[in-house]
Amino acid sequence: MVSFSTLLTACTAITGALGTPDLDRRQNVTPNAQGTHNGYFYSWWSDGQSPVTYTNSAGGSYSVEWSSGGNLVGGKGWNPGSAKEIRYSASWQPTNNSNSYLTIYGWTRSPLVEYYIVESHGEYNPGSSAEPRGEIEAHGSIYKLYESTRVQQPSIDGTQTFQQYWAIRQTHRTSGTVTTGTFFNAWAAAGMPIGQHNYMIVATEAYNSAGRASVVVETPP
């Protein structure tokens, strides 16, 4: 899968002052935005190629529905992120097991890192194009660790070369608790250090697919 989420900040920098996204009725595409909603940080981006709606709901809830094609990623969480126990529940329904995943997603600086803790994914395994870095057992499952280098790609600091870290759950689930510090420590032990935290969200991500998701972040903002 194209790592379209790395485009997020570059594309939302222009739209960050928009506040809570509203549906563009003419194009049926929710505008890109970042901000705060009911105490939670949220981030939303799509490339505009798929009819898609992202909706911030009460508390830590959000929903997203996409129809076909295009790249999109969004969700609610914290800015900055941290070693945190994240409780979440979701109805995550990619059509026909299509290319999508439900993930904890975030960035750090010094070093500049984009990271994923993937709880569920469709037919495409996002670790398939990365280098394996071992595995850990956590939260009742094996998580396989991967690393890749993104060369001169969009990031939270503009176009940069940076590392991308993955922890991919082998027994998929759509609700539970993720202790992010467990994965930060596992990555560090594998020679993959985490830096100073930027944002961290419980995200829905999709590429050239269709589906819907309703997600509740239960951990307080």
Curated annotation (Swiss-Prot):
Originating organism: Verticillium dahliae (strain VdLs.17 / ATCC MYA-4575 / FGSC 10137)
Reaction equations catalysed: Endohydrolysis of (1->4)-beta-D-xylosidic linkages in xylans
Keyword S-adenosyl-L-methionine attached: no
Signal peptide coordinates: 1-19
Enzyme class: hydrolase
GO biological process, one term: xylan catabolic process
Positions annotated with a glycan in the UniProt record: 96
Recorded superkingdom: Eukaryota
Record's protein name: Ethylene-inducing xylanase 4
